[in-house]
């Protein structure tokens, strides 16, 4: 009896599970019989009990695990494995009666006494609560009889055309038990799948969700998720529905879909049966793209290909050349003839030898006039005050019989015909204003170069070259094509077998530091990738059209229905939370290592380094101006290094005596009698001819009456004194300069942001820290650098030149543009002119100034004993040979290549507001070093006041903002000292050590043709359109798909607005 055995919780649970299994079998059998009659067949004893208990007249039950009467929520506590393996109960259950199929009825509930009772009839579900009551309790996540994987909660979407772009999101439980059954009218009722697990939607959304519909407009799939798109009407309002569907059924077969009435996609895969497929329109667009590429390739034909050509420079109209040069412009480019170093120049109305007019170091190298056509013409460039000066000159026609001149590489006498050689004229007419000091033609860069420099002076402009252009020509032999040089820009460095390329040259392949150029069709495809945007490569159409075509195809497939916005949000954008920042703070940080600021967290510059590729440029020995001398309290009889050995050091005297362009002078100061000779004034007449009769010497002998002889004190009544000075340019054995080229440089800034270290560059200027994101306004990389490693008597230091030198322009005479030797034995440049010696008294006001170029001042100094005097020697700049001296390197280079012209800008994105003040107090200890109006930035250093950023101004010129503390910046100064500096308020005087612009001017000479930068153009719109027809055609082709794409994106954005933030 039941009274003798107590009922435990395990027994009750097993009973409930058995009743649940029986009820599920009853519901499944009743639902099948209500939809279609089962054919009569023989049943075995295991299933006859279940069929005998069915009630054919009961209400129709729906298949599935909804409303099965179980009391336990299996989603929280699944049954143990041994309980799931129990056999089904063989107790016959009452057969449910069948009901009319017009209205679904609520399921029966199993009672504790073994009977069943219907739930109260609630009619069609109008809210989530009624829908849940109509289905029974929430189904489990796992079916007790299977091990099929399920998902806890999935998302479906609904939207109505009557409500605009308002999307409703429905979160519901979804079990992988197969597709719900169809109603008798063939419609698919999703109400069986409605079991909300998120916020309850409004009642009209639930009614629309439960509305049966059999039309499927499209299928969306991604990964293991599949969505079916439907549209239908509810009460006259058109609704759209995006439902999550199962991928596979329990039996392993693909779950069948409802019948499609609008579109059916047949693409299948082993894992995901429903995918998106591109059809005929996309194939047509791809074919059109390939046809465009084929047509463009056929148009290009055989064209030269260069993997990295020089940047193009469009020639300007010759409106600034003058009337006498314009008629030659159509003949460019052209080749010149060599000149020789012994030519003549016309200055004013007189002709003078070049050696009398040009600086001395022009005479040693090869140079010549440039012959345009029937006139001798030339161009002369001088750089000063941030600009270049040039003009074009012409003189009388050459003689009727041309005469070959000496080559640039060989300055010796060449073979000449019977006629006299034509002088190299570079006439200077009145428009040039006479000969400019320090200007002259250029030495040739390469021995096989048949061109020569041109004399330039006068008008203000900047010289340029036409861009390098190539052509292709066929020839007999292998390879059957060769490259023809149409125009060549020398700084591009194109060479053919080691010889510079000239206009008209033919070569199978050209090589330059930037790459290779060839006409080979085999390399055209690969080389066209680098030049994809040029006019001659049809690959430009491919590069420009492919992204738009791909975006158009994707957006066309995604935006063809209004459900695309919801599909994209559900499949792609769901769960994405973009970062947001509250406030931004901006400040500056100086570029010296160790600088710190508050932005608002502490930011410190830990260090700066740069990375580059190094190419060795050789080594050279610079010229060195060396001088020595002696002050003697008598007149020597042997004026030489041997005769003056007691007063003059032997080693430097011998080195200077054996140098080039030596200057040697001997002065007799107030001499009256010495050694028994009557020293009269005529004895030291100018030139010293009378003195040399008795004392032969190689030095110039000059009297110095009127100079102070107080250096030789002790004999006031019989005072005699002489001064000897010797100077020349020598090659010092312990002074060398090695050149290294740095390319592809990249500056790396090492920052510490509130203790977090990070590196920023121009490619990645961000630091992501726990306090926020720091964006650094990094100055541009310095580009190419030239390093001069100077070793002067054991003291080695490095100087840096910014940028690649323009060896055919302003930097023609810099040491880096010369050919060096690995053993540092070659001297740079030509032999300089001889220095000038001058005797100056100790109280002469002239000593308050500096010696001029190429001058050496000697001054006697009173000794500590009687008849013992010394000599003070001061040497000025090196005159015309300045660019070949160590001081030129110091003036045109810097000691720190990583120093940018201004501070670093810091933009810190944080969640709290930060406001940094601006100070108006003047900066302190400001020092300006460098030059003004010379094209080289001057260095400005100082100490900015605290309290905020300082907007630094120098003589009214804004140099940008600097942070508080020590700052170092650079700027082009256009005004001479004194300099007034301020931060926007009170100003202060800055100390300055600047050089006059005349001391920083240098000469540059150009090769070949040159054009000028003008402020206007004579090109019409028709000419511009004819020159850019390929770009205009390509733009018109891209405009049509771009317009359609923009319209498609606008439609997508309208519906995406509500899909991202659904109700």
UniProtKB/Swiss-Prot annotation:
Residues 301-534, 583-1028, 1050-1063 are extracellular. Residues 556-582 are cytoplasmic. The chain crosses the membrane at residues 535-555, 1029-1049. Residues 93-107 have a biased composition (Pro residues). The keyword Glycoprotein applies. Gene3D superfamilies: Rubella membrane glycoprotein E1, domain 1 (2.60.98.30), Rubella membrane glycoprotein E1, domain 2 (3.30.67.20), Rubella membrane glycoprotein E1, domain 3 (2.60.40.2650), Rubella virus capsid protein (3.10.50.50). The keyword DNA damage does not apply. Residues 563-582 are annotated as: Functions as E1 signal peptide. Disulfide bonds join 153-197, 590-595, 619-824, 641-653, 699-712, 758-767, 807-817, 931-934, 950-983. Structural polyprotein: Contains two internal signal peptides that are necessary for directing translocation of the glycoproteins into the lumen of the endoplasmic reticulum. This is Structural polyprotein. It comes from Rubella virus (strain Therien).
